[in-house]
């Protein structure tokens, strides 16, 4: 959802980029001497480049068009880096819920041959770290002293460098996501341990909600005490809850499988993915 909104915004801002053929001070002085309608000539010339004329210009096109586009690119870059970081952490040895494609000839670590490094996700994060600070320069290039100066003659050359880095990160992230594999057993283990020291503690929240629905006024306190008992005895949350015989509706079927406590996660994720996939196709 975050990335989809940003992509749409990038497309909108890219279409708003403007150009100029209005002479060194934007007043069409020279063109007025050789053509009757210099603004028409400007429109036709820029049309070949897929651009419209800037509403106003001096020696430069208004810098905000490009600035806004670059800022939105950096927003998307941050979203991609955030995703890369999440996937990188999920591939840590002690979590291991997902992992990138790993070929039979690939080396994960120079000292630990058994290790798989999430190097693609790490590379995306590294690209973002290198490119993100350049936003400060984009802002600085918004200022053109006394209509025109050459203090951006070097700095703006690195815009292409930034766009190349952003494009590389997008390509690498696409590769990561398309080849991502899941370890469902590790995911189930994470779910089981989600309650910390309380086995099956992830069900504590729905338990006190159901108790409240059943008319139990101190459901939260009851569940809190059950979790303390679970910590002492090592018994799973559902086992102790069942022994209390609190009469929670549907407890037998609901609490036997913690995976049922997922709300609309799957349905909403699929709906959002389908929405933006359709928008990208136009």
Give the location of each predicted region.
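Glycine-rich cofactor/substrate-binding loops
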Residues: 110-282
């Amino acid at each position: 959802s975050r990335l989809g909104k940003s992509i749409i915004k990038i497309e909108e801002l890219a279409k708003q980029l403007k150009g100029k053929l209005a002479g060194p001070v934007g007043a069409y002085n020279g063109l007025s001497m050789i053509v009757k309608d210099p603004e028409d000539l400007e429109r036709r010339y820029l049309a070949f480049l897929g651009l419209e004329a800037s509403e106003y210009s001096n020696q430069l096109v208004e810098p905000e068009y490009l600035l806004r586009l670059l800022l939105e690119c950096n927003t998307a870059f941050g979203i991609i880096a955030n995703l890369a970081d999440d996937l990188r952490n999920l591939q840590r040895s002690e979590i291991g819920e997902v992992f990138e494609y790993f070929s039979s000839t690939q080396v994960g670590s120079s000292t630990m041959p058994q290790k798989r490094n999430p190097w693609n996700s790490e590379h995306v994060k590294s690209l973002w770290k290198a490119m993100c600070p350049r936003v400060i320069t984009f802002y600085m290039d918004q200022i053109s002293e006394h209509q025109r100066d050459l203090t951006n003659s070097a700095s703006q050359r690195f815009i292409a460098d930034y766009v190349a880095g952003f494009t590389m990160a997008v390509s690498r992230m696409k590769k990561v996501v398309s080849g991502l594999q899941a370890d469902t057993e590790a995911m189930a283990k994470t779910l089981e341990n989600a309650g910390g020291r309380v086995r099956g503690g992830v069900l504590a929240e729905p338990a006190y909600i159901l108790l409240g629905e059943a008319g139990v006024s101190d459901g939260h306190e009851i569940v809190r005490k059950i979790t303390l008992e679970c910590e002492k005895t090592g018994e799973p949350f559902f086992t102790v809850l069942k022994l209390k015989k609190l009469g929670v509706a549907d407890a037998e079927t609901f609490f036997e499988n913690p995976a049922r406590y997922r709300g609309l996660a799957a349905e909403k994720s699929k709906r959002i993915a389908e929405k933006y996939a359709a928008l990208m196709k136009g």
